[in-house]
Design a protein with these regions (language model features):
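Structural and coupling elements of P-loop NTPases
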Residues: 1-247
């Protein structure tokens, strides 16, 4: 994987497989714990050297993301789980670390670990750098993730099915509620919103609001296209649209 995707790859787990190549044990390298199909178990003795080596690599990846952690690591050549998580979270935010996990949707092994890792290592919106944008005059500006700011959202995908058209949005600033009217700088139209949805697979669950950093869907926005910005009419910004690869 590293040969293909580069040194940012950071395995968070080590695995043990049986004769049929089915994974039987997953070791959480961050917390130094092992799990099998029944739950937490002892780390297998024949995995000790591999786990030690991979944990050392993970510590280096975490330390490399933060100068303070790097100094701490060089002093003792060891980092606590909390320090490792801190460094990895910084690395994930900056793109210098790409965690790799293992799991099976069929057996359920590793799924809990994946969910916990997302909570522990993936930064929330307010930790992320500001989004690039333009104002009405075409000047470059930045839009910080601010839950209390004037609303700004980007339409990143459009879905059409037997139930109609859904505009998928990511809220960069403020929040979106169904009783709002938002301005579309691309068309000059003010759009009255209606029902909002949280998409779960192909099904939409109706919700009251989409908060800063969240994604959701707006139904029946016929004049809105993928890449459009939806924003407060008194605070117009144009967020960077989707860059499509050349055919």
């Amino acid at each position: 994987i590293k040969a293909k995707f580069g040194t940012a790859i950071a395995p968070i787990v080590a695995t043990k497989a049986d004769a049929n190549k089915a994974v039987t044990v997953i070791v959480d390298l961050l917390h130094n714990k092992a799990y099998d199909a029944k739950g937490e178990c002892a780390i297998p003795g024949d995995m000790a050297d591999e786990v030690e080596a991979l944990r050392a690599e993970l510590m280096e990846a975490a330390a490399g993301a933060d100068e303070e952690l790097m100094e701490k690591f060089f002093e003792s050549m060891e980092l606590s789980a909390a320090d490792m998580a801190k460094g990895l979270k910084i690395g994930v935010r900056d793109g210098s670390v790409c965690p790799v996990l293992c799991g099976s949707a069929v057996t359920g092994m590793g799924v809990d670990m994946l969910m916990k890792t997302i909570v522990e290592l993936v930064p929330v919106a307010t930790d992320m750098p500001a989004e690039k944008a333009q104002d009405e005059s075409g000047n470059e500006v930045e839009v910080a993730f601010d839950p209390n700011g004037p609303t700004a959202a980007i339409v990143f995908k459009t879905i059409s099915d037997q139930y109609g058209k859904f505009s998928m949005i990511k809220v960069v600033r403020g929040k979106v509620t169904g009783d709002m009217s938002l301005y579309n700088p691309a068309t000059g139209n003010t759009e009255k919103l209606g029902r909002l949805y949280s998409m779960k697979g192909k099904k939409g669950e109706e919700i009251k609001e989409i908060c800063c950093g969240d994604i959701g869907a707006i139904g029946k926005m016929d004049r809105v296209k993928t890449g459009n910005t939806m924003c407060d009419a008194k605070n117009v910004v144009i967020l960077e649209g989707i860059e499509y690869p050349a055919p």
